[in-house]
A protein has these predicted regions:
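Membrane-integrated ABC transporters
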Residues: 1-165, 179-183, 209-237, 241-244, ...
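Primarily ABC-family ATPase nucleotide-binding module
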Residues: 71, 75-79, 215, 219, ...
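A hydrophobic transmembrane-helix motif
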Residues: 127, 171, 175-180, 243-285, ...
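Loop segments that connect adjacent transmembrane helices in multi-pass transporters
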Residues: 291-342
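Cytosolic ends of transmembrane helices, especially the final helix of ABC transmembrane type-1 domains
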Residues: 294, 298-302, 317-321, 327, ...
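Helix-to-loop junction immediately C-terminal to a conserved catalytic motif
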Residues: 492-493
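Conserved "ABC signature" C-loop
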Residues: 517-565
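ABC-family ATPase nucleotide-binding domain "signature/switch" substructure
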Residues: 527, 561-649
Length: 649
């Protein structure tokens, strides 16, 4: 079944982008948050323009003071331009814009707490971006004067401007280097913040569990990839695109005037040509988004199939299932490569279009500018400047056409990450709805009129169950599929679908031990202390807990601080005993045991249950063995259609 959504460059894509990107800069729970964010970005840009205004005036003053020959003889037009910026109305306008910018940020200070870094870095990047654009404009004039002086054989002017060019390069190198460094650091900080944000929400309200159990939406495939890779791609590409768009706008504004002064026809023709090219690129981009989306999903499926083999290598080896696993892995590889073949075709089509689009634009420049030169209406240096201005504007206007492959890939990431973001926001709301089990805090476990349903349906696994476990231990029995494990999960508080009331200790006083205990990636000390942090228990306490379960040899064989793959080193029986050692060490009020002694012999099983009784830990068990009866005093047998039988043992 294909769950791929419909893709388009539309409002849905824009909304998902904003909802994912905005929280780093401005909280989403503020009234009119999107409008306020837009205003802050605009006033930041306008404030930089105002600062640039005053900087150019200052630069003109410094050049006129220390290099009067340059401003009077070589660049008189620059001096005229600087003097025009000294108009009182322009000065007042820039001061007003700066005041509005300061006021806008001041009124939103309470919303920008812990968000000073992104705004500071963004402000620095915008300043550097204006500086780079200014350098490009200045270099276009320098190249113009250099070529004109060569053509007219004005040696002195040539050498003077060559020195100016050298100075401009020396000035440009640190600015460009710092500009690129700041962009990369901004992306790094954004990725760190957004990843932490997603991870914290992923572990809240058991989202990781609900998504994995497919109880809400099967479209959220490979959340690990979305967190680790899609966020990285989103932050880096978003930053690149937004800065490139701003740079394109500055370039268009800066160089269009130069191009328009040389040839109005060339400027108009360029705009029409770019509009047609962009329209064609967007049409092809719609198809590319779907292909990129599928490629990300299929590559993740292929990678997961290899991880699945690694995690289940022993079972595969016992079953001699190598041939089947090879077929499964290669099937996923084939699906990824098949989609990649389609991607190659469309990439080739777009590459051909981009090549023709870029190279055909050389003809208008030759056709329209050359006659002006032959008619002696422009000098030779103006041709060079026309080339520079034309291709600067052409590149800026063609940002969509030239980047359509990256934009399509980026849009696919937005859909994946945006969908994941929406689901992480939806789950807490789902958990707060009325069709959920009501939980109360109590020292004992009691259930009142409890009905447990399957995810996304009204089918009852258990209906109207009531019992009280004061000084009693419960054994749950029944055929496979009648809801035994679901009831344990409901009592634990991780399965909330249904109705009724459960009273139980808080989460810190409940421990769950499944048939195959969870082995964390850590040391032996971390393993037995889990879920508490390392250092919570002394070495003697840990050693005593292991000794009670007959596992003291693990310290001698492996060391307490050695990090190993415990799920592979230990047998299932050893893992189950280690799980009981965790319970003995952590001393919860109640233990939830889901066939937790299935791999133990009778001696170790009896020892484990005896330790629970000796430490006054109440427990609820699921099991099939008849010898489990002696460890419990209450039996609950579940049958199909939600019915049950509750009796004393």
């Amino acid at each position: 079944m294909n769950n791929t959504p419909k893709f388009n460059f539309n409002k849905e894509l824009l909304d998902r982008f904003i909802n994912t990107a905005q929280p780093y800069f401005f909280p989403t729970d503020v009234k009119k948050s999107k409008l306020k964010l837009l205003i802050l970005i605009l006033v930041s840009i306008l404030s930089v323009i105002s600062i640039s205004h005053f900087f150019i005036i200052f630069l003109g003053f410094m050049l006129d003071t220390f290099f009067p020959k340059f401003t009077n003889d070589l660049a008189p037009n620059f001096k005229i331009y600087v003097n025009s910026l000294k108009e009182p109305n322009l000065i007042y306008l820039s001061l007003g814009v700066l005041s509005i910018g300061i006021y806008s940020f001041y009124t939103n200070l309470k919303h920008l707490q812990n968000r000073y870094r992104p705004w500071l870095l963004l402000f620095i990047i915008i300043i550097l971006l204006f500086s780079v654009t200014g350098l490009n404009v200045g270099l276009s004039y320098i190249f113009r004067f250099l070529d004109t002086s060569l053509n007219t054989r004005e040696e002195k002017v040539f050498w003077d401007f060559l020195w100016v060019y050298g100075g401009a390069v020396l000035l440009a190198v640190p600015i460009i280097a710092f500009y690129r460094f700041t962009r990369l650091k901004f992306g790094r900080y954004w990725r760190e913040w957004l990843t932490n944000n997603f991870i914290s929400r992923y572990f809240n309200y058991r989202c990781y569990y609900l998504l994995d159990s497919n109880s809400l939406n099967s479209d959220i495939d490979n959340p690990d990839q979305r967190i680790s890779e899609d966020i990285k791609h989103f932050t880096s590409v978003t930053l690149d695109f937004l800065i490139d768009i701003l740079y394109a706008i500055l370039t268009i504004v800066s160089f269009s005037a130069i191009l328009y002064s040389i040839s109005k026809t060339l400027t108009l023709g360029l705009i029409i040509y770019v509009f047609i090219g962009t329209w064609i690129a967007i049409l092809t981009g719609k198809k590319m988004i779907r292909i990129y989306y599928d490629q990300l999903r299929l590559e993740a499926d292929f990678r997961y199939s290899l991880v699945h083999v690694r995690d289940n290598s022993e079972s595969i080896a016992f079953y001699r299932g190598e041939k089947k696993e090879v077929n499964n892995v290669l099937k996923r590889l084939f699906n990824a490569l098949k989609n990649f073949d389609l991607l190659i075709i469309w990439q080739s089509i777009i590459d051909l279009f981009q090549f023709m689009y870029s190279n055909l634009m050389r003809f208008p420049v030759y056709i329209l500018v050359a006659p002006l030169y032959f008619a002696k209406e422009i000098d030779f240096g103006t041709i060079t400047q026309a080339w520079i201005a034309f291709f600067q504007v052409f590149g800026a206007l063609s940002i969509v056409t030239n980047q359509i492959e990256n934009i399509s890939s980026f849009a696919a990431s937005i859909f994946r990450l945006g969908n994941f973001n929406e689901m992480l926001n939806k789950i807490p709301d789902e958990e707060k709805t009325n069709n959920r089990i009501n939980y109360l805090i109590s020292n004992n476990v009691s259930v009142d009129k409890l009905s447990v349903t399957t995810p996304g349906s009204d089918k009852y696994l258990i209906k109207d169950l009531s019992f009280d476990l004061i000084n009693q231990n419960l054994l749950i029995k029944g055929e496979s599929g009648v809801g035994k494990s679901s009831l344990l999960r409901a009592i634990s508080g991780i399965w909330t679908m249904g109705k009724g009331e459960i009273s139980k200790p808080d989460f810190s006083n409940i421990m769950f031990l499944p048939q195959k205990p969870y082995m964390i990636l850590g040391t032996l000390e971390e393993q037995i202390s889990y879920p508490k942090q390392q250092g919570e228990y002394s070495f003697d306490e840990i050693k005593e807990a292991l000794n009670k379960l007959g596992l003291e040899y693990l310290i001698n064989d492996h060391g307490i601080n050695s990090t190993k793959d415990w799920s592979r080193i230990l047998s299932v029986g050893e893992q189950q005993r280690l799980g009981f050692a965790r319970i003995i060490l952590n001393k919860p009020k109640i233990a939830i045991l889901d066939e937790s002694t299935s791999a133990l012999d009778e001696r170790n099983e009896e020892n484990a249950y005896k330790l629970l009784k000796d430490t006054s830990i109440a427990y609820v068990s699921v099991g099939h063995r008849s010898n489990l009866n002696k460890f419990h005093n209450l039996s609950l047998e579940l049958t199909k259609n939600g019915s049950y039988k509750l009796e004393k043992i």
